[in-house]
């Protein structure tokens, strides 16, 4: 029993370390993706000629 407990403890420790690093990386990646997507949408809207009021309304509702 003691041996199993010891093993699980070390395993969880390594897992936590890995998880933490992976999580931060994923979060950063997600943020950049969202940002880039938003910018592209804005550019597209300006090019097409969407009304400013409509765009602002959409953005407000989204956030």
Curated annotation (Swiss-Prot):
It comes from the Eukaryota. Testis. GO terms for molecular function: DNA binding. Its main location: nucleus. InterPro entries: Protamine_P1. One of its GO terms (cellular component) is nucleosome. GO terms for biological process: chromosome condensation; sperm DNA condensation. Residues 1-63 are annotated as: Disordered. It is found in: Nucleus; Chromosome. PROSITE patterns: PROTAMINE_P1 (PS00048). Keywords: Chromosome, Developmental protein, Differentiation, DNA condensation, DNA-binding, Nucleosome core, Nucleus, Spermatogenesis. Belongs to the protamine P1 family. Protamines substitute for histones in the chromatin of sperm during the haploid phase of spermatogenesis. They compact sperm DNA into a highly condensed, stable and inactive complex. This is Sperm protamine P1. It comes from Sminthopsis bindi. The lineage of its organism: Eukaryota, Metazoa, Chordata, Craniata, Vertebrata.
């Amino acid at each position: 029993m003691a041996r199993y407990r010891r093993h699980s403890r070390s395993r969880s420790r390594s897992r936590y370390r890995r998880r933490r690093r992976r999580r931060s990386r994923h979060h950063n990646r997600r943020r950049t993706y969202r940002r880039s997507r938003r910018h592209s949408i804005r550019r597209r809207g300006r090019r097409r000629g969407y009304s400013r009021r409509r765009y602002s309304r959409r953005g407000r509702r989204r956030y």
